[in-house]
Amino acid sequence: PLGVDYMLPPRAEVQRPWGAPDAYIRPSAPFPSAKSLGLAYTLLTPVMLACLLRLRSIWLRVALLIGMALSTVPAIATSNRGMFIGLGISAAYVLLRQFLAANWRAVGMGVAAIAAVIVALFASGTVDNILGRQDYSDSTGGRAALYRATWNATLESPIIGYGTPRMEPSIGVSMGTQGYLWTLMFCFGFVGLALFALFMMCTVASGARVKTASGYWLHSVPMACCVVFIFHSFDIAQLTILM
């Protein structure tokens, strides 16, 4: 049950889609699902990079680098597409800010690092694993159908919404899930969604004045959230991290 998973989260989310030769084992602890772990990793990685840039002790830097390197193993094993999209947005944003600041050394290092990560993802089979999972589980098509149903239902109660997610029998998933944007829109109407969008705009605008590398990484968190909240739910610790 979901309540038990919140209190005693499993170490991994085991998925057995119909027709798949083997089960997909996706690390999730200390969260109830691999998606929650992926989103937390998306939000906290830029924070750790900002912390790394501000540390003065070489030993603390080495310890943090080792910890971050080890954390990539379960993160990659989640095969979470949203996590890679969010981290890519953060990295691209920081690279753009460094480019606009004419910090060519940082730009060169950033391009090299991004290229190395892309090569590693293909070489490790991570990309093949993500694409292979889609052959047996059309989660993209299922989400699209759910989003259409959520939109149509919200149009019937656009001001105050429905208060809580509701099951869509034809899809088998509750409307108002699979993305915080849809949760806000379905549960609290377009008014609730507009208020959260205003909060995000103010957060992005207030952080645009940063001029340091660590500041760029911290500011990349709300920038990435402007996209990942479309398909990720900020329902556990993620919203606290953002705020």
Which residues does each predicted region cover?
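A membrane-periplasm/extracellular boundary helix in multi-pass inner-membrane enzymes
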Residues: P1, T78, L95-Y136, W151-E156
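Alpha-helical transmembrane segments of multi-pass inner-membrane proteins
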Residues: P1-S79, F84-R97, C202
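Hydrophobic transmembrane alpha-helices and their immediate junctions
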Residues: L52, I58-R61, G88-A92, L96, ...
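Short, aromatic-rich membrane-interface segments at the entry and exit
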Residues: L60-A63, G82-F84, N103-M109, G215, ...
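Aromatic-anchored segments of alpha-helical transmembrane domains
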Residues: A69-P74, I114-F122, P222-H232
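Membrane helix-loop boundary segments at the extracytoplasmic
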Residues: S79, T183-F188, S214-M243
